[in-house]
């Protein structure tokens, strides 16, 4: 089991100025992203990849959510992940659909478990895997193989530097 550890959280409620956000990411061991705006999600993914910081991504609305663990050098960036899924698979806006709170609890616990595993090195991280949860059908789907894309200026470059 995981021994005693000390974890400090910093909640950033709004998109900070770029320089402030860069320093916050640089000072972090891990970033957990639950933003609503896709451009902010992609900007944060780019920052984490450039800083070589793991990013736990959550996207969703209503009763459909997805989780992705981005590990620089081991998995693709969020931009490449979304491009590989295509627009027909994108999840709508939380503002338009709302969020079922009981499902949000499951998602939050999954993010917390992912964070503990990354920070402690305990268990296997779910990098390269997209976990899709559909609360309406009760289906959970795991898609694998989201490796760094060699010609991507973010995840491809980071992988090249790590090799």
Task: Label each residue range with its predicted role.
Residues 1-163:
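Adenine nucleotide-associated cytosolic modules
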């Amino acid at each position: 089991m995981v021994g005693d550890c000390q974890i400090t959280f910093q909640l950033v409620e709004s998109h900070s100025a770029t320089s402030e956000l860069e320093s916050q990411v640089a000072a972090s061991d891990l970033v957990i992203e639950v933003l609503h705006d896709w451009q902010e999600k992609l900007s944060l993914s780019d920052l984490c990849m450039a800083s070589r910081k793991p990013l736990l991504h959550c996207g969703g609305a209503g009763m459909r959510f997805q989780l992705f663990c981005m590990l620089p050098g081991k998995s693709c960036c969020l931009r490449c992940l979304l491009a590989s899924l295509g627009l027909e698979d994108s999840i709508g806006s939380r503002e338009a659909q709302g969020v079922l709170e009981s499902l949000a609890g499951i998602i939050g616990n999954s993010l917390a478990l992912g964070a503990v595993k990354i920070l402690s090195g305990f268990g296997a991280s779910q990098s390269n895997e997209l976990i899709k949860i559909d609360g309406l059908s009760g289906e959970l789907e795991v898609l694998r193989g989201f490796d760094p894309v060699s010609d991507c200026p973010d995840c491809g470059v980071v992988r090249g530097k790590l090799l």
